[in-house]
């Protein structure tokens, strides 16, 4: 009887071992390195830092279908993060044409170059965003994302710009965002949104001549404050930035009643890739041990 039981255990163990071995052999090997994406040179109009991004949250928000309130805030957060260092630079002042409008964002051709650069970077990470139609792209047309340079804005409540555009020093109101915008929950987003109110343009502004222009400049100053946060610490702030962008740019409420999405709606957020890598790494260690548990059990039974 004991001999028969031993033979049965050996047979079961051999079958389990062959199954585990075959699964391990067919499992694809994941590379440890992330392919680098070429960064735009100084001479090109659009300079995005996309060398090490894996665009956490974009697939969840945009991969299946295009929904403005779900997809656009995540896309905008990653585009602002990639453009952050360039946006905060103050180039040497150049003579501007008399016909130029200081309230305008980056020129359309330049914005399109940024869109093309971002889309190419997304494709290298196997992320394909659906296009609304043949004449409308997801980023510029559908989401309406526009990039600005700090030198094109007048945000005295947010940045002190020295004469000659040599330095842009963040005000206390902007530095306060570091404390108020660390939590991406509904309550944290609401706190951050309240702190951003202090960056709005008050009264007259030398770069705006209409009430509509002042409102647009106020929103752009708030977006530049969020851009400064992303330049300071993208990993810590990009989830909250995407939540706040949803309230500022894609909320169904009127502009003066911007509200963050309740936690119950479970809206997707932009998440730094490192967080995904850490969680995957910890779980992969666990799953790597699981296939060998049946073998350990067989050996234990055999020794009884």
Swiss-Prot record:
It is a lipid-anchor; GPI-anchor. One of its GO terms (cellular component) is side of membrane. Residues 91-111 are annotated as: Disordered. Residues 283-304 form a propeptide. Keywords: Cell membrane, Glycoprotein, GPI-anchor, Lipoprotein, Membrane, Signal. Residues 1-22 form the signal peptide. It comes from the Eukaryota. Transmembrane segments: none annotated. The keyword Signal applies. It is found in: Cell membrane. A lipid is attached at residue 282 (GPI-anchor amidated serine). Glycans are attached at residues 133, 160, 183, 233. PANTHER family: GPI-ANCHORED PROTEIN, OS07G0557700 PROTEIN. This is Uncharacterized GPI-anchored protein At4g28100. It comes from Arabidopsis thaliana (Mouse-ear cress).
């Amino acid at each position: 009887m004991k001999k028969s039981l031993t033979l049965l255990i050996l047979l079961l163990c051999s079958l389990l071992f062959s199954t585990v071995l075959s699964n391990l052999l067919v499992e694809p090997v994941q590379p440890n390195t992330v392919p680098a994406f070429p960064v735009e040179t100084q001479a090109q109009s659009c300079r995005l830092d996309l060398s090490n991004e894996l665009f956490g949250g974009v697939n969840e928000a945009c991969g299946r279908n295009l929904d403005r309130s779900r997809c656009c805030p995540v896309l905008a957060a990653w585009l602002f993060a990639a453009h952050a260092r360039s946006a905060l630079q103050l180039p040497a002042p150049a003579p501007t044409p008399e016909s130029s409008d200081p309230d305008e964002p980056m020129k359309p051709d330049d914005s399109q170059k940024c869109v093309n650069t971002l889309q190419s970077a997304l494709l290298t990470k196997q992320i394909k965003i659906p296009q609304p139609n043949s004449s409308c792209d997801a980023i510029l047309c559908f989401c309406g994302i526009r990039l600005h340079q700090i030198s094109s804005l007048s945000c005295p409540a947010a940045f002190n710009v020295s004469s000659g555009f040599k330095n842009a020093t963040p005000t206390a109101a902007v530095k306060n965002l570091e404390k108020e915008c660390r939590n991406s929950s509904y309550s944290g987003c609401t706190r951050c949104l309240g702190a951003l109110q202090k960056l709005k343009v008050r009264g007259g502004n030398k770069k705006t001549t209409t009430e509509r222009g002042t409102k647009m400049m106020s929103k752009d100053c708030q977006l530049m404050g969020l851009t400064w946060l992303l330049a300071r610490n993208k990993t810590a702030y990009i989830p909250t930035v995407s939540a706040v962008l949803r309230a500022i740019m894609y909320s169904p409420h009127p502009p003066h009643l911007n509200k963050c999405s309740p936690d119950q709606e479970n809206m997707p957020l932009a998440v730094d890739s490192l967080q995904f890598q850490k969680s995957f790494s910890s779980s992969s260690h666990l799953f790597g041990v699981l296939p060998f548990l049946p073998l350990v059990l067989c050996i234990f039974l055999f020794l009884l």
